[in-house]
Amino acid sequence: DGVLLKAVYATVQQSYAGRFFPINDAIREKGLNTVELKYALAIVYDLTGDSSLLDVVSMQDGVVPTHEGEALARDLSLGLTTPFPFKSSLLRDGSNGDQGALAILRAGDARGVAVVFKPTSQGLGHGHFDRLGFLYYDDGHEVVADYGAARFLNVEPKNGGRYLPENETWAKQTIAHNTLVVDQESQFGGDWETGQNYAPHVIAYETVNGIQLTAAELDTAYEGVSLQRLLALVPQPDGGQYIVDIVRARSDTQHTYDLPVHFKGQLIETGFKLDHATSQLTPFGTANG
């Protein structure tokens, strides 16, 4: 059913402003200009003639030295490009599509609003403990960010490239992501093999009266705690989008909850009083990031 073509298009959809979403052990600098995707797009364009792929190729800083690549260069020079349809998508996870999903909500053009919601499977040893986490982009910029992997890539003095110890002690931990932390611990006790056995359940992905929304639940990340999260894009009357984020945790016993938001913008206003650390910064805890 054209699964390879679908895989290429889905790969492009998992990007913003030319860079891939930095989830799990992704390298933040990796993007659409990776050589593997250059070859893939050249082949797909040769098969389909989809002029919107030229829009993606224009972000790749060159074409591959093949007959297919020559056709791309020719058609780019002829001005045959049409905009690539970056769109809202639900990319189901697992071999049977039943291990959660990656939900992408978009509004506007390629540089418009994009919200990425991650109720996915663990992703084996490269997975991070960030179920029900999210990312937010707008106007071509990353607004709510993911740390990605802590790794040297192709750096010869660093043994050719390796993961740093901080990839385990920080980058993979739940606190390094935009999702709820319970009792200052990482999801599944920081054990990926345990996490691999469980996946969130996507309970909504729909558009209602112009409002795009997605929601998921997970009751296995922390013993005795059920987690739910809903994210929505709500159009503003004068243009733009409100981002609505609702997180719910339920348990029969008492717990502490922390909700980190790795925000790269400027905090202007809140509906609650803030405590300010003006003289020194201290760690929130002693372990798990």
Where are these regions (language model features)?
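Active-site-adjacent "lid" and substrate-binding segments of diverse enzymatic cores
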Residues: 10, 18, 112
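Phosphate/oxyanion-binding loops and surfaces in catalytic or ligand/nucleic-acid-binding neighborhoods
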Residues: 14-18, 183
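Glycine- and aromatic-rich loop/turn segments at beta-sheet edges
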Residues: 17-26
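Low-complexity, serine/threonine/proline-enriched polar segments
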Residues: 285-289
